[in-house]
Amino acid sequence: MSDDTLIACLATSPPPLLAAYAHLKHEESVLVTGWRRTGDEEFMVGVRWPAAFGDLPYDPRLLTQTIRQSGLLVAHAVYEVPLTHQTMLDTLDFTVAPRFRAPLGQPSELDVRVTVEETAGNRRAGSSLHMRIHLIRDGVTVARAETEFRWISPRVYRRVRGDRLTFDWGSWPVPAPVAAELTGRASAADVALAPGDGPRRWLLRNNTGNRLLFDHPVDHVPGLTLLEAADQAAQALLAPTRLVATRITTTYYRYVEFDEPCWIEAAFLPAPAPGLCAVQVTGTQSGKEAFRVRLGGVAREGGDAVPPGDAVTPGDAVTPGLRAY
């Protein structure tokens, strides 16, 4: 389906409503543009990415935000999940076409196919939704994800978080970042890592001025922010070589708090195949492991351009196992 056909068929919503569905305060952070039903449990979502810059083939933050926003849009607009409920992302594993690259210097349009495979609880306001998500550009699938969204009521969430629920937003110190080029990012404002106390070890840097990572006040570090920090740690580990990640799996063990240091460590894993590399990144807070991310893909010298192509095929199976909060 062409972009023009999709846009013509999309069930458009006012920008403020799309922002609410995506749990975002700032409309400029909203990537989803509308949706339409294509089957009993299948939907097509329109997505617009801003212009890409830098030496990475795509912005990992836009990829993960696309998955998140598309799933939330379907959950709220179609399945009527209450906006007052807290979202818990139980699983998020994805693969990316090895040669996918966002066009440099110009916005790009994507189609996102969301298939809801199973629903637990009441269908119209279910406690969980299992989704398969395909990102499509020019009719070709360039990324696939499998995820499960869960929701809990405000009352239950208050019980879970206790006295951590209220927090003086932005009151923590923000240390100076590592060099942006070390992480493959375009500017210091995008860097989520600060120098650590040893090699391959960094301090998580929670800069609330980065709206793509911190759109609005929350009581714990968002899971996608931790995933972004892990990607940057993998880039720093390989620098000046760049990791073009094609498979990512993440496990979250506990909430990461703002008022305690969180240490990020990266290490090489055995290569899964000739020409490929794998990295494991762990986050530790108060002496306990808080999350773990494994990234696999191709290392490319000096951020060489990766031409577009190579669709994700059915053989590129996603690996279950992510628990993200």
PLM features: residue spans?
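Non-catalytic linker/capping segments at the edges of enzyme domains
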Residues: 1-55, 150-214, 306, 318-325
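HotDog/MaoC-like acyl-thioester-processing domains
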Residues: 1-7, 111-176, 269-325
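Hot-dog-fold acyl-thioester-processing enzymes
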Residues: 7, 37-86, 200-236
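Hydrophobic residues on conserved beta-strands that form the core of alpha/beta folds
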Residues: 32-33, 89-91, 130, 142-144, ...
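Intrinsic-disorder/low-complexity, polar/charged segments enriched in Ser/Thr/Lys/Arg/Asp/Glu/Gln
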Residues: 40-44, 109-111, 144, 199-201, ...
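Hydrophobic beta-strand-centered segment that forms part of the acyl-chain substrate-binding groove
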Residues: 73-115, 231-268
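Acidic/His-leaning functional-site neighborhoods
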Residues: 188-263, 278-282
